[in-house]
Amino acid sequence: MVHPLPVFKRYTGNTHQKKAIFGQCRGLPCVAPLLTTVEEAPRGISARVWGHFPKWLNGSLLRIGPGKFEFGKDKYNHWFDGMALLHQFRMAKGTVTYRSKFLQSDTYKANSAKNRIVMSEFGTLATPDPCKNVFERFMSRFELPGKAAAMTDNTNVNYVRYKGDYYLCTETNFMNKVDIETLEKTEKVDWSKFIAVNGATAHPHYDPDGTAYNMGNSFGPFGFSYKVIRVPPEKVDLEETTHGAQVICSIAPTEKGKPSYYHSFGMTRNYIIFIEQPLKMNLWKIATSKIRGKAFSDGISWEPQCNTRFHVVDKHTGQLLPGRYYSKPFVAFHHINAFEDQGCVIIDLCCQDNGRILEVYQLQNLRKAGEELDQVYNSAGRSFPRRFVLPLNVSLNAPEGDNLSPLSYTSASAVKQADGTIWCSHENLHQEDLEKEGGIEFPQIYYGQFSGKKYRFFYGCGFRHLVGDSLIKVDVVNKTLKVWREDGFYPSEPVFVPVPGTNEEDGGVILSVVITPNQNESNFLLVLDAKNFEELGRAEVPVQMPYGFHGTFIPI
């Protein structure tokens, strides 16, 4: 049954509960229930629909994130460690059903069988097997982190597509192929069986023909390198997974013993853009982490004395372009978009000047309350959209000090230095009002039509809390915002779904899963008109859900 959309309480400004002054907050509500273990709901639950869901909106919103944070007496330390919980909101002719299932990864099954944490995760070192003797437990510390058997297959970050099939992935060498109808794992895939990489990102890019590109790492006896990966669009055999994948370019790290940690990369029609940022992975610390009784995350540190470097690769030839582009230190977890214009690559990112966010996402921090929670939030960096310009054809005769950007519509500059490098200064794609929203993350665009092209709009979550507390539409041309927020609710990454056949950049709807720590309220799937950012409807589900990471919409 569909119900008229009632008037819900919204934030219209600062309240006595929360006061935001340029990122400084007091009185943040505790969100610990959003970061605790929940039960799966494998049988479809009919949602109570308020307002309306467009009749053309037929398909499934798939989401994934951590949903279990302990086994027996063992507890995970970091938000990124929780066991993968798959969510499905299925929409058909205005009705909505929900289900969720824990991914039956080898890690999940081994932990469940032993009732303890058997496999180490990003921020948690597995406990030694109590059934082994002292010598066996000691020797188990010497298994290298890069070895496939030592890596988790708890793929809890994103759904990705290769050759028409969907996979769950994180940043290790393992992916899990999934049946998007049943949410059941069908196959475990190891990247390293096909190409020489130890892992790849959870944010590949796609050409219109389905060719996929990704960034990975190679870590072995010959050192460390970043890898650009290409996966062909078509299967030769129905049983294929990532067969035919190729490494088309290898990039040596600027600092051999301390390569950069990265979460995503950029792509235009012709180029891959990879950013080496001063969030460093200390290879010695990582290689000796088990011996020292430390988790993988102990080997990652923010080193703001180092600048950020941009690498540009021709994705057709695999050639690394000679330009040496640098900027002041920042961290970017998510790229917004990138495109080419007048001999330049323009790249838009969500950037933070404080790279300690991985430390902030320790579960003990996220679950704090009162003044301690305020202190954690106020110590964290904020993420803001910035534009950089990378001129591709730099003349050796270009005078030192010249701004090499020919683009009149951006204040981003690229200035040639005496040593031939190019110093890139960004343009802010926002005004002061976004600072009052706590910045923005989880950026999304109309990917199918505007990825790698000049664009105007993107969508994301505002962060006046440690998790997203609003949805925001950003106009990067006029630098204006539209905001949706509701008191006591926390929306997930927005997913843009276009009206069938449209080429309009905001011609469609935004889907977001909105959850609350209040046990007397229902979580819901929200649908907004992407143009005016007004609510069209919501589908309430009386099921506890944790705050997750990423997802995708798959039309029927």
UniProtKB/Swiss-Prot annotation:
- Key word Mitochondrion present in the record? yes
Query: What enzyme class is recorded for this protein?
Result: oxidoreductase
A Pfam family assignment: RPE65
Q: Where does Fe cation bind?
A: H203, H263, H334, H550
* Residue stretches spanning the membrane: none
Q: Which GO terms describe its cellular component?
A: mitochondrion
Output the InterPro entries linked to this UniProt entry: Carotenoid_Oase
What does the Swiss-Prot or TrEMBL cofactor note state? Binds 1 Fe(2+) ion per subunit.
Localisation per UniProt entry: Mitochondrion
Write down the EC number.
1.13.11.-, 1.13.11.71
Quickly give the catalysed reaction.
all-trans-beta-carotene + O2 = beta-ionone + all-trans-10'-apo-beta-carotenal; 5-cis-lycopene + O2 = 5-cis-10'-apo-lycopenal + (3E,5E)-6,10-dimethylundeca-3,5,9-trien-2-one; 13-cis-lycopene + O2 = 13-cis-10'-apo-lycopenal + (3E,5E)-6,10-dimethylundeca-3,5,9-trien-2-one; lutein + O2 = (3R,6R)-hydroxy-alpha-ionone + (3R)-3-hydroxy-10'-apo-beta-carotenal
Cofactors demanded by this protein: Fe(2+)
- Cite the GO molecular-function annotations of the record: 9,10 (9', 10')-carotenoid-cleaving dioxygenase activity; beta,beta-carotene-9',10'-cleaving oxygenase activity; beta-carotene 15,15'-dioxygenase activity; metal ion binding; oxidoreductase activity, acting on single donors with incorporation of molecular oxygen, incorporation of two atoms of oxygen
Q: Name one GO biological process term.
A: lycopene catabolic process
Q: What is its main location?
A: mitochondrion
Isomerase found in the keyword field: no
Which UniProt key words apply to this protein?
Dioxygenase, Iron, Lipid metabolism, Metal-binding, Mitochondrion, Oxidoreductase
Annotated family? Belongs to the carotenoid oxygenase family.
Q: What does this protein do?
A: Broad specificity mitochondrial dioxygenase that mediates the asymmetric oxidative cleavage of carotenoids. Cleaves carotenes (pure hydrocarbon carotenoids) such as all-trans-beta-carotene and lycopene as well as xanthophylls (oxygenated carotenoids) such as zeaxanthin, lutein and beta-cryptoxanthin at both the 9,10 and the 9',10' carbon-carbon double bond. Through its function in carotenoids metabolism regulates oxidative stress and the production of important signaling molecules.
State what protein this is by name: Carotenoid-cleaving dioxygenase, mitochondrial
